[in-house]
């Protein structure tokens, strides 16, 4: 820590608040350098945190955290917060098994008020916390930091609308890192922000409201004049004013002294406050400033070279999906690809560039994405919604009400199904089979490799009804890709004929199942479909084997194994059943390999679980 003389002194925000203001620019420089060095050695989210260094320092300098409650939305930008709140020396463990959590996490620190991972939750939770503090007359402040992407979600605006109507004391900070700040405009904004957040303006504003409340024409004139002055710099402010907030900004989010002055002024204001700051994602590190998307989440890399390591030559399942999408779009101009702000992650970059008229990024709006797709299907188009398993949870009602009930031909390409690795509890794709399996009209497919994935996507595209294909994060296994052809709905595939024991596989654990089967001389069936289920195959297997093992990378409760159990019960089959899958707890971070081993879903673990079960029967 010799390179970081000031940062090495900061073990909590109390230490930070002992520094004089003239030391803060140096601290910000050290914090940014330390963040870059630590993340490059451990992997993690980089660009967002580089852009919030000054904001983080200013917030902990002005507010008395943890008494004052600071909430970070999503959490990608909270690495500097972790460093300043006693976790500096553990940053090398972030996102690793047993290490620091990738996002703010209540169990990890008293400074983490809200556990996060999904976007747009901070204002709703913050309002609840603020109202509780107001009811108990605690005198504590509530501050929510939300990004320009997360604030586009409907939930954020629902919360803003509520907060403005109840007029509770809280501060919402919009971290807008869409573009760099113009120096001239920034200076004007900073000056205006000091005026608008100052006590004189605040007193005049509140007094004026009372005095002019009985004089509508004059009141309206004053209001419009005020908004015109603000709108000269930021027309967006009018929107938040209409929602009931006192809007300040935009100001330079990298000017530590201006941030502190504005925050100190706003600290004394009553009612809902809204501060709009402009930051640059990747600030202070040229490669990240140039490519903020590429440096959003990074593997281990040499930060001195500024180059990210090249990925494997084997395509990911996301890339397999993207290639399939392009292949079909050439033939069918009515194919429409939809993503809720996950173009890169879902493998849709090439598709968006080659077929811009058939591509829609609806922003962080999963509910809208699904019902938008329903509308396209009603109009005769063929929508494909590319969505992570964990984010499909946010559109469950739309999946049922707007797609399935109307039996509309919408295809769901469900990425990151199963264990996702380093992002932990909030991002595991553990529940999609369970929450989809009970929905009528929905076809659900689980590919075992990339060729099966392509065929299932094509089958879902052609079947004329709601369909879902769920596939994992990471690289495919390198099998040969065959010409596209529709699969017969609800029909499984025999992989290996054995005796006594049969493994019914759902998904990409098939390679592990076949390894186990060699040692046990077991039958292996790639079930392919969770719905409709191949009940005929299950009946045949039950009549010729003494033990059926179901294998899936989904919660055991309500998953594919449960579907098999229900079928065996309905058929009144006398056969033992072992259901293997994800346990009834939220699964923490770790690599996919580490977590599958811990959950005993690799070949060794599957073999062990079967042998232990055999000893009981």
Curated annotation (Swiss-Prot):
Catalytic activity: D-glyceraldehyde 3-phosphate + pyruvate + H(+) = 1-deoxy-D-xylulose 5-phosphate + CO2
One Pfam assignment: Transketolase_C
Annotated binding of Mg(2+), by residue: 148, 177
Keywords: Isoprene biosynthesis, Magnesium, Metal-binding, Thiamine biosynthesis, Thiamine pyrophosphate, Transferase
Record carries keyword 4Fe-4S: no
GO MF terms held by the record: 1-deoxy-D-xylulose-5-phosphate synthase activity; magnesium ion binding; thiamine pyrophosphate binding
Entry EC number(s): 2.2.1.7
Binding residues annotated for thiamine diphosphate, in chain numbering: 76, 117-119, 149-150, 177, 285, 366
GO BP of this protein: 1-deoxy-D-xylulose 5-phosphate biosynthetic process; isopentenyl diphosphate biosynthetic process, methylerythritol 4-phosphate pathway; terpenoid biosynthetic process; thiamine biosynthetic process
GO cellular component terms, A-Z: cytosol
Cofactor: Mg(2+); thiamine diphosphate
Cofactor, free-text remark: Binds 1 Mg(2+) ion per subunit. Binds 1 thiamine pyrophosphate per subunit.
Alphabetical list of InterPro entries matching this protein: Dxylulose-5-P_synthase (IPR005477), THDP-binding (IPR029061), Transketo_C/PFOR_II (IPR009014), Transketolase-like_Pyr-bd (IPR005475), Transketolase_BS (IPR020826), Transketolase_C (IPR033248), Transketolase_CS (IPR049557)
Pathway given in the UniProt record: Metabolic intermediate biosynthesis; 1-deoxy-D-xylulose 5-phosphate biosynthesis; 1-deoxy-D-xylulose 5-phosphate from D-glyceraldehyde 3-phosphate and pyruvate: step 1/1
Function: Catalyzes the acyloin condensation reaction between C atoms 2 and 3 of pyruvate and glyceraldehyde 3-phosphate to yield 1-deoxy-D-xylulose-5-phosphate (DXP).
Family per record: Belongs to the transketolase family. DXPS subfamily.
Quaternary structure, from the entry: Homodimer.
Protein name: 1-deoxy-D-xylulose-5-phosphate synthase
